[in-house]
Amino acid sequence: MTAVGEALRRCRAEGRAALVGYLPACFPDVERGIANLQALLDGGVDILEIGLPYSDPVLDGPVIARAADVALRAGSTTAAVLRTLEAVAASGAAAVIMTYWNPVEQYGVDRFAAAVAAAGGSGLVTPDLLPDEAEAWLAASDAHGLDRIFLVAPSSTDERIALTVRFCRGFVYAASVMGVTGVRERASVQAPELVARVRRYTSLPVGVGLGVGTAEQAAEVAQYADAVIVGSAFVRCVFDAGDDAPAALRKLAADLAAGVRRMPATG
């Protein structure tokens, strides 16, 4: 079992959902990016999703796309992302890389998988890769003991969900709303139904992402999901806080961590 699998099992034993925090690597530069990820852990994030900045982030909203641009201008490379992963994993963190598929193919699929494993990573979240087009990744992830986290969405047919979860390992990423990433004023009404549909086909943990940005939303999603995934809210926090980003991230992470631990109201 990977470190991510262990973290999810520990959270389940505690009777709560896991908090997954996303930030791009090298944002706003390599060293401050590492410090920001560490701040998420210090605030109570259970699992890190480290984004590999990409020049054509078609599934990301304006906040994350802007952050990727900042990271690329600061000199983000695949090697720098792997160094970031190694730095946070060395502290004991459970971490995965979230990446579009093109950079992995350019680096070499097996070579990339080997590098992620060597750096202490648990696997990859691959938002634009379909499992039935992922033969090289399936083989590489098996060879190097990595989790494969594919996405499903409200628009996914039952057949597509069944196929996708069959090839997932670690957890299933349920994109709770249609469209690009970003904080919503309210959590998606489609998310509980999507999670229920996924659970018809797998016993893997299900994480819900896209739109969660407040403790109240985290508490709501934690009532039906195994993991609450937060991205854009953390990225916006870095932009807003500037040099004070680590302290601001710790506070926001602590608020969200309290949210996933909140017991639902009764009566």
From Swiss-Prot:
<feature type="active site" description="Proton acceptor">
    <location>
        <position position="49"/>
    </location>
</feature>
<protein>
    <recommendedName>
        <fullName>Tryptophan synthase alpha chain</fullName>
        <ecNumber>4.2.1.20</ecNumber>
    </recommendedName>
</protein>
<dbReference type="InterPro" id="IPR011060">
    <property type="entry name" value="RibuloseP-bd_barrel"/>
</dbReference>
<comment type="function">
    <text>The alpha subunit is responsible for the aldol cleavage of indoleglycerol phosphate to indole and glyceraldehyde 3-phosphate.</text>
</comment>
<keyword id="KW-0028">Amino-acid biosynthesis</keyword>
<keyword id="KW-0057">Aromatic amino acid biosynthesis</keyword>
<dbReference type="InterPro" id="IPR002028">
    <property type="entry name" value="Trp_synthase_suA"/>
</dbReference>
<dbReference type="Pfam" id="PF00290">
    <property type="entry name" value="Trp_syntA"/>
</dbReference>
<comment type="subunit">
    <text>Tetramer of two alpha and two beta chains.</text>
</comment>
<dbReference type="InterPro" id="IPR018204">
    <property type="entry name" value="Trp_synthase_alpha_AS"/>
</dbReference>
<keyword id="KW-0456">Lyase</keyword>
<feature type="active site" description="Proton acceptor">
    <location>
        <position position="60"/>
    </location>
</feature>
<comment type="pathway">
    <text>Amino-acid biosynthesis; L-tryptophan biosynthesis; L-tryptophan from chorismate: step 5/5.</text>
</comment>
<dbReference type="GO" id="GO:0005829">
    <property type="term" value="C:cytosol"/>
</dbReference>
<keyword id="KW-0822">Tryptophan biosynthesis</keyword>
<dbReference type="InterPro" id="IPR013785">
    <property type="entry name" value="Aldolase_TIM"/>
</dbReference>
<comment type="similarity">
    <text>Belongs to the TrpA family.</text>
</comment>
<dbReference type="GO" id="GO:0004834">
    <property type="term" value="F:tryptophan synthase activity"/>
</dbReference>
